[in-house]
């Protein structure tokens, strides 16, 4: 009944924000957590450049399972991006380590959490909602919507689709199955996923990264974690980890593609969905 262009909502504890906006056909679409983080960081970077506030010491942070499109935006705009483990204590750690030497300008994760300022050391929906309103006003000044800005990002930096698959294994037998699955991935790492060769494997339990030729380099992380990541030649990223709170193993899938124009979203998304299904078939999930 009310002609809205955007709907946003905080969680009851005010730590995460979700949103929906209208697409180019006037239909409501949900913006996922990866897209939310991407939009926030894209705007922060572009706004700092446009207003002359960008400094060589600026940096942003994302978690290792969050979309790699953020890295593409950071690299093209020559800003340092740091990867950390899931959880905002790790983002807060990066802020603390660089306090007085570098300037944190934003960071987030794929599960709708974002931290826009460094005076809060946890995900904060209050400042995120204020930032969201600012982005919407910025878009409107250009005659665009939030959806249009997202399409602009995909055209400039490439299209990506992210999917999380949860494989539930209840009980003690389930915990044993999850352990066996992780052990099997380590003992028999896939050489190909979804029809594309694996070019890099990261094992955060051993803190080692191994490329397709067997060359091993160290991962610079503060401690070990039971997480595996696979990167393929076509830009796909798969992250695998047992849940720390529930009886399940989580697969974070991100596939890449090209999007030639803002109106090409449907075809780019359809191709990405095919890639996701191919990845799931390869992994047996």
Residue ranges of each PLM-predicted region?
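A short, sequence-level motif marking secondary-structure junctions
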Residues: 35-37, 242-246
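Phosphate-binding and adjacent anionic-ligand microenvironments
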Residues: 9, 19-29, 47-241, 259-265, ...
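Catalytic or ion-translocation cores adjacent to nucleophile or general acid/base/metal-coordination motifs
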Residues: 33-44
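Short, well-ordered strand-loop elements centered on a beta-strand within folded domains, enriched
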Residues: 10, 27-31, 249-253
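Single conserved hydrophobic/aromatic residue that forms the stacking wall/gate
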Residues: 1-13
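A hydrophobic, small-residue-rich beta->alpha segment in the mid-to-C-terminal subdomain
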Residues: 247, 252-262
């Amino acid at each position: 009944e009310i002609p809205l262009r955007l709907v946003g909502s905080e969680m009851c504890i005010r730590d995460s924000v979700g949103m929906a906006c209208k697409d180019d056909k006037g239909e409501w679409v949900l913006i996922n957590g990866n897209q939310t983080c991407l939009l926030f960081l894209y705007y922060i970077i572009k706004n700092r450049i446009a207003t002359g506030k960008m400094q060589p010491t600026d940096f942003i942070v994302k978690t290792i399972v969050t979309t790699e499109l953020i890295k593409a935006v950071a690299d093209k705009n020559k800003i340092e991006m740091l990867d950390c483990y899931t959880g905002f204590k790790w983002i807060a750690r990066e802020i603390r380590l660089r306090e007085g030497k570098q300037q944190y300008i934003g960071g987030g994760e794929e599960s709708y959490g974002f931290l826009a300022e460094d005076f809060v050391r946890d995900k904060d929906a209050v400042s995120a909602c204020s930032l969201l309103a600012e982005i919407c006003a910025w878009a409107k000044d250009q005659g665009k919507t939030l959806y249009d800005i997202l399409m602009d990002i995909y055209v400039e930096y490439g299209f990506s689709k992210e999917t999380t698959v949860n494989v539930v294994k209840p009980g003690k037998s389930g915990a044993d199955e999850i352990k066996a699955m992780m052990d099997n991935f380590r003992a028999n790492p896939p050489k190909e996923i979804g029809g594309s060769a694996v070019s890099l494997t990261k094992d955060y339990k051993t803190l080692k990264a191994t490329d397709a030729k067997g060359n091993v380099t160290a991962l610079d992380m503060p401690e070990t974690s039971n997480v595996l990541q696979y990167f393929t030649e076509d830009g796909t990223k798969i992250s695998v980890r047992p849940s720390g709170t529930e009886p399940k193993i989580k697969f974070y899938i991100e596939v890449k593609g090209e999007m030639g124009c803002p109106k090409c979203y449907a075809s780019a998304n359809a191709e990405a969905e095919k890639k996701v299904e191919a990845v799931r078939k390869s992994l047996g999930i």
